[in-house]
C-alpha cells in the first residue's frame, strides 16, 4: 500500500509539474501573441500615417500648380500684375481674364471644369490667367486689382472678367460664400450668346 501511495504521490507530482509547465508555456504563448498583435497594430498605424502623409504631399503639390497652365489649355499667363496693361494692349477684341489663386481644392476644381469650356469654345488665345496667390496676403489686394483693371466689380476671387472692345462687359462671380465653378462661366457665355473663336 505504501508503495502504491508513493507511486500515486509521484504521479500526482509529475502531473502537477506537467500542468505548471503547460501553464507557463500557455502564458509565454499568450505574451508572444500579445506582442505580435501589438507589432501588427503598430505597423498598421505607421503604414496608415505614411500613406496619409504621402497623399497629403501629393495633393498639396497638385493644388500648388495651375491645372489650366500645366495642361497646356491656356498659355496666356499674366505673371505680374504690373504687366497687365501692357499685355492687354495686344489682346483680341473679345477676351476673358481668370483672376485666381493656387493651393486650394476648390480653385483647382474650377480650373479642371474650365478646361472643357476653353477647349469647346477654342478660347486658348483669348483667355488670360492671373494667379494672385502671393498678393492675397496684402490688406488692399482687392483695391489693387480693381485699380489695375479700372473697375470696382472685383469683390472676391476667383473671378472671370469678360471684355469686349476694351470694355468690361461682365464678371463671373458668386455672391454666396462658394467659389465660382465652370457652370457659372458657361451661364455667362450663354447669356451673351458667345459663339467662340
Which residues does each PLM region occupy?
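ER-lumen resident redox/N-glycosylation machinery signature
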Residues: 38, 113, 117-118, 168-181
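N-terminal targeting leaders characterized by basic, low-complexity, disordered sequences
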Residues: 1-18
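Thioredoxin-like thiol-disulfide oxidoreductase module
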Residues: 128-170, 177-195
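N-terminal leader/targeting and pre-domain segments
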Residues: 12-15, 25-43, 47-93, 182-197
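A short acidic (Asp/Glu
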Residues: 107-111, 139-141, 173
Amino acid at each position: 500500500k505504501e508503495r502504491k501511495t508513493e507511486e500515486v504521490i509521484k504521479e500526482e507530482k509529475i502531473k502537477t509539474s506537467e500542468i505548471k509547465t503547460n501553464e507557463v508555456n500557455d502564458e509565454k504563448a499568450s505574451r508572444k501573441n500579445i506582442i505580435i498583435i501589438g507589432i501588427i497594430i503598430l505597423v498598421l498605424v505607421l503604414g496608415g500615417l505614411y500613406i496619409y502623409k504621402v497623399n497629403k504631399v501629393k495633393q498639396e503639390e497638385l493644388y500648388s500648380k495651375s491645372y489650366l497652365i500645366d495642361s497646356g489649355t491656356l498659355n496666356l499667363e499674366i505673371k505680374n500684375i504690373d504687366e497687365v496693361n501692357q499685355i492687354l494692349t495686344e489682346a483680341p477684341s473679345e477676351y476673358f481674364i481668370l483672376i485666381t489663386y493656387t493651393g486650394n481644392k476648390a480653385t483647382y476644381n474650377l480650373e479642371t471644369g474650365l478646361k472643357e469650356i476653353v477647349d469647346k469654345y477654342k478660347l486658348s488665345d483669348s483667355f488670360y490667367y492671373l494667379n494672385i496667390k502671393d498678393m492675397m496676403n496684402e490688406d488692399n489686394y482687392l483695391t489693387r486689382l480693381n485699380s489695375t483693371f479700372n473697375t470696382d466689380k472685383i469683390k472676391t476671387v476667383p473671378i472671370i472678367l469678360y471684355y469686349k472692345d476694351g470694355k468690361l462687359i461682365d464678371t463671373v462671380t458668386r455672391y454666396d460664400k462658394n467659389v465660382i465653378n465652370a457652370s457659372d462661366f458657361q451661364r455667362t457665355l450663354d447669356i451673351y450668346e458667345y459663339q467662340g473663336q
